[in-house]
C-alpha cells in the first residue's frame, strides 16, 4: 500500500461529524472528484469517482447520515493488472441531487439560473473546524503524497484555476507556503518541504501518518549527517595522504641531490621523521621531537623543506 493510500485510509476513520463538518468534507470530496451528468430525459445525476474504497464508503455514510440519501457504491472493474478498480457513488435525480449540490457548493443559483460554482464556498471555511475538514475532503478527493523515503511532495489536483488559487489561500492561512502550477489541463496546489507537509497532515488529522513521516525525516537527517561527516573525514584524509606523499617526494629528492645532512638540524629532524613515519599526522610527528613541536611548527618546517626541493628541481632543469 502506498503512503498516500495509508494517509487517506487513516483520515477516512473520522465519521462522527456535525452536519456543517459533513457538508464541508463532502464539498471537498465532490468538487474535485465528482462529475455532473444528465440522463436522456435531462434528469440530473452526480457521480463521485475514486480508486479508494474507504473514500467511497465515507461518502456513502456522510450522505446517508446527514442527507438521508441512500445511494449505492458501484465497482468498475479494471482489466489492467496495473490499474485499480474504480468505485462510484452515484446520486440520482430522485435522491434530491440538485439540493445536495447547492448545499455542498458544487452548484449555485443566481437570478434563477443554476450554474457550476468554481469557487471555495465561504460556508466551508468560515470556522477552523470546517476549514480543516474541508481541506481533508479535498485531499481525499484529489490529493496525494509521495513516499517520504524518496522525496517530500504533497499535492491537490483540480481542473479549475480559480478554485486552485482559492484553495491555496485557504491552506496558507495556517502559515504554509503552498504554490499553484498548471500541469496540462489540471491545476496543482503543492507543498515540497517536509516540515510543511507534516503541518498539513496535522491539519487534516493524519496523526499516525505524521509520526511515520517524522520518523523517516529523522532517519534521513541522521543518514545525511553521517554521510557529511564521512565525506568530510574522507576529504581530510585524502588531503593528509596527498600532502604526506608530496612531502616524502620532496625529502627523497633532497636526499638524492644534496643529502639530508645539508639541511638545518630542525628541518633534518622533521625530514627523517616524515620518512620513517609516513602515516603519522603532523601533530603526532611534533610529539616525537624533543622538545615537542606543535602542528603549525611541523607544518612550517615541512613547507620550508618543500621549498628547498622546489628550488633543486628548478636548478635541475
Swiss-Prot record:
InterPro entries from the UniProt entry: Homing_endonucl, Intein_endonuc_central, Sporu_reg_WhiA_N_dom, Sporulation_regulator_WhiA, Sporulation_regulator_WhiA_C, WhiA_LAGLIDADG_dom
Biological process per Gene Ontology, one example term: cell division
Q: Does the keyword Cell division apply?
A: yes
Quote the Pfam families the UniProt record gives.
Answer: HTH_WhiA (PF02650), LAGLIDADG_WhiA (PF14527), WhiA_N (PF10298)
| SUPFAM superfamilies, per the entry | Homing endonucleases (SSF55608)
- What residue ranges does this record give for the DNA-binding region? 281-314
Which keywords does the record carry? Cell cycle, Cell division, DNA-binding
- Alphabetical list of HAMAP family matching this protein: HTH_type_WhiA (MF_01420)
Record family assignment: Belongs to the WhiA family.
Protein function: Involved in cell division and chromosome segregation.
Protein name (Swiss-Prot/TrEMBL): Probable cell division protein WhiA
The protein's organism comes out as Clostridium novyi (strain NT)
Amino acid at each position: 500500500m502506498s503512503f498516500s493510500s495509508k494517509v487517506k485510509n487513516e483520515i477516512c476513520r473520522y465519521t462522527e461529524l456535525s452536519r456543517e463538518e459533513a457538508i464541508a468534507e463532502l464539498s471537498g470530496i465532490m468538487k474535485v472528484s465528482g462529475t455532473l451528468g444528465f440522463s436522456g430525459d435531462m434528469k440530473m445525476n452526480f457521480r463521485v469517482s475514486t480508486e479508494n474504497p474507504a473514500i467511497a464508503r465515507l461518502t456513502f455514510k456522510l450522505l446517508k447520515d446527514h442527507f438521508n440519501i441512500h445511494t449505492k457504491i458501484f465497482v468498475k472493474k479494471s482489466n489492467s493488472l496495473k490499474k485499480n478498480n474504480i468505485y462510484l457513488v452515484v446520486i440520482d435525480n430522485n435522491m434530491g441531487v440538485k439540493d445536495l449540490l447547492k448545499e455542498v457548493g458544487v452548484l449555485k443559483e443566481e437570478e434563477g439560473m443554476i450554474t457550476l460554482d468554481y469557487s471555495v464556498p465561504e460556508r466551508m471555511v468560515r470556522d477552523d473546524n470546517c476549514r480543516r475538514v474541508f481541506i481533508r475532503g479535498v485531499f481525499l478527493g484529489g490529493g496525494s503524497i509521495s513516499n517520504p523515503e524518496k522525496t517530500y511532495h504533497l499535492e491537490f489536483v483540480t481542473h479549475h484555476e480559480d478554485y486552485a488559487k482559492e484553495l491555496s489561500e485557504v491552506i496558507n492561512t495556517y502559515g504554509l507556503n503552498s504554490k499553484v502550477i498548471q500541469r496540462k489541463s489540471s491545476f496543482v496546489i503543492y507543498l515540497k518541504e517536509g516540515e510543511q507537509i507534516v503541518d498539513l497532515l496535522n491539519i487534516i488529522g493524519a496523526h499516525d501518518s505524521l509520526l511515520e513521516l517524522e520518523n523517516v525525516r529523522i532517519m534521513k537527517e541522521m543518514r545525511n549527517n553521517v554521510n557529511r561527516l564521512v565525506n568530510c573525514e574522507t576529504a581530510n584524509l585524502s588531503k593528509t595522504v596527498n600532502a604526506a606523499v608530496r612531502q616524502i617526494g620532496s625529502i627523497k629528492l633532497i636526499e638524492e641531490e644534496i643529502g639530508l645532512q645539508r639541511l638545518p638540524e630542525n628541518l633534518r629532524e622533521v625530514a627523517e621523521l616524515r620518512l620513517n613515519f609516513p602515516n603519522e599526522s603532523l601533530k603526532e610527528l611534533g610529539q616525537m621531537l624533543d622538545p615537542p613541536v606543535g602542528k603549525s611548527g611541523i607544518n612550517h618546517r615541512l613547507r620550508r623543506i618543500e621549498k628547498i626541493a622546489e628550488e633543486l628541481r628548478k636548478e635541475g632543469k
